[in-house]
């Protein structure tokens, strides 16, 4: 089996996650890392035994010829860096958001087609509670889907004050965490038809760790309303002003519901509310009858985002979450900002197909 060589654009703390995931995979080598500040690249290379480090990413691409590049640079650089990497012959996995505007996102999508390279964007929902939930999103268990709600809210990024700078980040909580809430909804319900949104900033001054004071120029409070195929409505919330992390999705059916919990507020990662028997343990939940704690799918390093990305490279196919779905997320968030500014709902035009075997009768 051919060894896949991986390079990293960005040496901040987010890169650690991907480096560690890659170390757990067979026949994968972390070959090089780039940072604008050479000392950051050197320190990260020493920490993880990465042989080469650079402060010129084009030189890194030319000299090390990686099979794939992980892009974790500031948001406003995602498009340029990703396109340059694909042009140089590398597949790309890019942190969220895909880009800071819809035009750049479309150019990234077109570049992946032009250069015939995989463009894998985040978010990544393929965790045990989500993949297990899909097995029960069937008419047999919950009836026809009637609505849904998804949320990712927390106090706000404690690091890197550029997150609060619109010129660099492109947007605030909408782009940073709204993409997660949206991704889970569209993975279940398919493409959004229309979006309406409210977006503002509630906290005009912030105190970062170390005592640094900043004045954000981005949104920290967002509520979105979506219309999906079949007339199903869903809502999403994305904020940076909650006192704690709230990260969950609920799918409501005519005769049941699915509670998917990604935070630590609930002892149960997944609860199925249904009158049908579920493989698992019957529990009491929210004072509802007929609730089940199902057995979750197993999760290995190969099931995580790096594992799926490497699998797609080896098999020359698109990953579970392909560029089309990432582009759709970018269009929805872009037009959510437009809706919040104009007070009018916005039509969504980008298509994609859900990656799981969804029943036609469910929606």
Where are these regions (language model features)?
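Hydrophobic residues in well-ordered beta-strands that form the structural core
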Residues: 54, 94, 119-120, 260
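C-terminal helix-rich "cap/oligomerization" subdomain common to oxidoreductases
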Residues: 3, 23, 59, 68-71, ...
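C-terminal glycine/acidic-rich active-site capping loop/insertion
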Residues: 204, 208-209, 214-215, 223, ...
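Beta-loop-alpha module in the N-terminal Rossmann-like domain of NAD(P)-dependent dehydrogenases
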Residues: 52-110
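A short helix->loop->beta-strand "cap" motif at the edges of active sites that frequently abuts
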Residues: 50-51, 88-90, 114-117, 232-233
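Rossmann-fold dehydrogenase core element
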Residues: 105-124, 143-148
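N-terminal Rossmann-like dinucleotide-binding module
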Residues: 1-48
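Predominantly a Rossmann-like dinucleotide-binding segment in NAD(P)-dependent oxidoreductases
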Residues: 124-215, 343
